Curated annotation (Swiss-Prot):
Pathway: Cofactor biosynthesis; NAD(+) biosynthesis; deamido-NAD(+) from nicotinate D-ribonucleotide: step 1/1. The gene is nadD. Catalyzes the reversible adenylation of nicotinate mononucleotide (NaMN) to nicotinic acid adenine dinucleotide (NaAD). This is Probable nicotinate-nucleotide adenylyltransferase. PANTHER family: NICOTINATE-NUCLEOTIDE ADENYLYLTRANSFERASE-RELATED, PHOSPHOPANTETHEINE ADENYLYLTRANSFERASE. One of its GO terms (biological process) is NAD biosynthetic process. The keyword Aminoacyl-tRNA synthetase does not apply. The lineage of its organism: Bacteria, Pseudomonadati, Pseudomonadota, Gammaproteobacteria, Enterobacterales. It comes from the Bacteria. Keywords: ATP-binding, NAD, Nucleotide-binding, Nucleotidyltransferase, Pyridine nucleotide biosynthesis, Transferase.
Length: 220
């Protein structure tokens, strides 16, 4: 049964490996919520396919870290559907399922980083994304502004909106390039710091740090 929205508030989905989740994930999307009027962000820990490099933390640990990171913050909820599957699913399939749950009129957005935008044409059914949701693009340190293919550049230009209010006025179909803070924090660097016994203070929430310590994660 679709969950109908009476006020057509803008909801967004933000996926990632989250190995571990950190402020480089959270701070930009919190700023994005302020900028575009997001009412809610659903965090979606990804199922990692066997042929790709495996996370150091297992699925249960990654899910727990995400839950701890946003506990008590009403802006966020956590959706574990991808982790509960036996095999990975394509992003478009998850978004289509969420669209069915939320109903046809709910404005929905998918948050991606600038790095993902540059390679979006390699995604499964990438051109169908805007039939289901909006795309919100967060800037990333060190990434080029130019897109790889003329087709992708033309697609971006034809769907780009400058006014974030447009995102709440229709359920899908727009791309918004957000002016979010550039935080040079990466999960790779956090894992390296842990392996080397270096401090990770101020890089991730304290509750996540405590859990990492208790579980003995990312040790050399």
């Amino acid at each position: 049964m679709p969950i109908k929205s009476s006020d057509h508030s803008l909801y967004a989905l933000f996926g990632g490996t989250f190995d571990p989740i950190h402020y480089g994930h959270l701070k930009p999307v919190e700023a994005l919520a302020q900028q575009v009027g997001l009412q809610h962000i659903i965090l979606l820990p990804n199922h990692v396919p066997p042929h790709r490099p495996q996370p150091e933390a297992n699925a249960q640990q990654r899910l727990k870290m995400v839950e701890l990171a946003v506990a008590g913050n009403p802006l966020f909820s956590v959706d574990s559907r991808e982790l509960l599957r036996d095999s990975p699913s394509f992003t478009i399939e998850t978004l289509e399922a969420l669209r069915k749950e939320r109903g046809a009129e709910q404005p929905l957005a998918f948050i991606i980083g600038q790095d993902s935008l540059l390679s979006l044409h390699k995604w499964h059914r990438w051109q169908a994304l805007l039939d289901v949701c909006h795309l919100l693009v967060c800037a990333r340190p060190g990434y080029s502004q130019s897109l790889e293919t003329p087709e992708l550049q033309q697609w971006l230009e034809s769907h780009k909106v400058m006014d974030p209010q447009a995102l709440s006025q229709r359920p899908h179909g727009a791309i918004y390039l957000a002016d979010t803070p550039l935080l040079d924090i990466s999960a790779t660097d956090i894992r390296r710091r842990r392996h080397n016994g270096e401090s990770c203070d101020d890089l991730l929430p304290q509750a996540v740090q405590r859990y990492i310590e208790l579980q003995g994660l990312y040790r050399g």
